[in-house]
Design a protein with these regions (language model features):
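N-terminal beta-strand-loop-alpha-helix module at the start
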Residues: 1-43
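Metallocofactor- and cofactor-centric catalytic cores in central/energy metabolism, strongly enriched
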Residues: 42-45, 223-224
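Gly/Ser/Thr-rich loops at beta-strand to alpha-helix junctions
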Residues: 45-47, 95-102
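A glycine-rich helix N-cap at a beta->alpha junction
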Residues: 49-82
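Conserved acidic residues
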Residues: 61, 88, 146
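Glycine-rich phosphate-binding loop signature in dinucleotide/nucleotide-binding domains
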Residues: 82-89
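Electrostatically charged, flexible surface regions
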Residues: 123-250
Length: 251
């Protein structure tokens, strides 16, 4: 099986320095189980080679770098290269970390190649993809003969980094097969992310239905047992109704 892994660069949440994207490292772990030598592919600037070597340190010999200036659309370069170098499976992380991590690149690539896409994969074995679903559920899908798969951030990080491998690995710089085009976000105005509202924490471990039922249940108490004759009971009831202003004094 020929496997190509699309690699991006993340950004450290504290220092802001470029780093490997953890979700792409998860994709490499899955690719390593499917084939001994998957193809590693990145589109970006050649000046980021030192950061890209972090991927080679996970146990890979070569990484293909399609040189593209900053701010150019990478999808066209990826689609053109993958058309010239077809493979059975294209893997990518669900999204990058701290960069322009919209997660749309795999979808655009799949559309450009006319392939199906399976998202949020946890593992791949025997032609089946285990997909992560909300609330911790899982779903097993039969994988098409050719497709694009995005790897969930819930997939395990199983590869270990070795500095010697990072130094010995080779980065092959390729020229883009298509002319670069301006990215869609070139005219956008970037602003710092605003902190969202803090979510309320649920203090009880009971389910929503249990909490709702508890609110709806009315407790007894405060009632009065009427004793005596019918006339006395009727007078007492009328008195209570007047106190509650449910009955006018004239009546």
């Amino acid at each position: 099986m020929k496997v190509t892994v699309l690699l991006s660069l993340g950004r450290h949440p504290k220092s802001g320095r470029p780093m490997l994207a953890p979700n792409d490292a998860r994709a490499l772990a899955i690719a390593k189980k499917l084939t001994d030598k998957p193809r590693l592919l990145h589109v970006g600037e050649a000046s980021q080679q030192s950061v890209l070597r972090q991927y080679l340190g996970l146990g890979f010999e070569q990484l293909d770098l399609i040189e593209s200036p900053h701010g150019q659309d990478i999808c066209g370069a990826l689609i053109a290269d993958l058309k010239g170098n077809p493979c059975d499976l294209i893997l990518a992380g669900q999204n990058a970390t701290g960069q322009d991590d919209t997660g749309l690149v795999p979808y655009i690539v799949a559309q450009g190649l006319g392939l199906q896409l399976v998202d949020r994969a946890l593992s791949i074995s025997d032609g089946n993809v285990t997909q992560f679903l909300p609330k911790g559920q899982r779903r097993v899908l039969t994988m098409p003969s050719q497709c694009v798969v995005t790897v969930s951030d819930k997939a395990p990080l199983e590869l270990e980094y070795v500095a010697r491998r990072a130094r010995q690995g080779r980065i092959e710089i390729l020229k883009p097969e298509s002319s670069p085009t301006a990215a869609l976000y070139q005219g956008w105005q970037l602003e710092p992310k605003q902190p969202g509202r803090k979510r309320l924490s649920i203090q009880s471990n009971a389910s929503g239905w249990d909490r709702f039922s508890k609110r709806m249940n009315t407790t007894g108490g405060g009632g009065e047992v009427l004793k005596g004759g019918v006339d006395d009971s009727a007078d007492k009831i009328l008195s209570v109704l007047r106190e509650k202003k449910l009955l006018s004094d004239a009546s």
